[in-house]
Amino acid sequence: MIAIVDYRAGNLTSVRRALEFLGHRCEITDDADKIRAARRVILPGVGAAGATMENLRALGLVEVLRRDVAAADKPFLGICIGIQVLLDRSEEDSAACLGVIAGHVTRYPGSIDGRPLKVPQIGWNRVRQTRAHPIFTGVPDNTHFYFVNSYFPVPDDPKVAIAESDYGVNFVAAIASGKVVATQFHLEKSGAAGLRLLDNFCRLEF
């Protein structure tokens, strides 16, 4: 079973439907024992870093995700806010995050060369694969994916980045370390390419 972590955020049902469409058995759950027992874990959703971490703490899931998922070498996928809270800290709400991957989360600038930059980024954007990773199997480089974000991850180790994009500035769009993989873009909203990445994660032999 694939556990979709329920921390009272949106988009969980969309991820479940995408997985079911692909033929994968999954469950939206906040049950720590079910998350520990799952063969893979997905942390998706939209929202603010501070509220996300508050909800995870209130549900008793912070250490479950740190110790029983990431540190236990269980395949772990973060999507959108899920990539951001994997890092140490976020400028949004000055939030202390999970610290699974060293780094921080920063906001897009309000302007570029004196011209206003519309934040959040909402829509399709080209993603460049910067490092070969099996999550991208069958997905051509420079494929467009769907983004909704005001903040983006900045890992301490540049080698953690596996994809990047541009929105006023160049930014990291996907990261991977061991069995932890995460994307800033929404797989469940990115059509066939997003479904392929989701399916790849579910089938990967790390």
List where the protein language model places each region:
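Structural signature of beta-strand start/N-cap positions in the alpha/beta core
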Residues: 25, 40, 75-77, 144
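Short acidic/histidine-rich motifs immediately flanking catalytic phosphotransfer sites
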Residues: 36-45
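Cysteine-nucleophile active-site neighborhood
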Residues: 47-122
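Pocket-forming structural segment of enzyme catalytic cores
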Residues: 88-167
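N-terminal beta1-alpha1 ligand-phosphate binding loop
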Residues: 2-24, 188-189
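Acyltransferase
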Residues: 183-206
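Short, surface-exposed beta-strand/loop micro-motifs that present aromatic residues
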Residues: 169-176
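Short acidic low-complexity segments
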Residues: 26-37
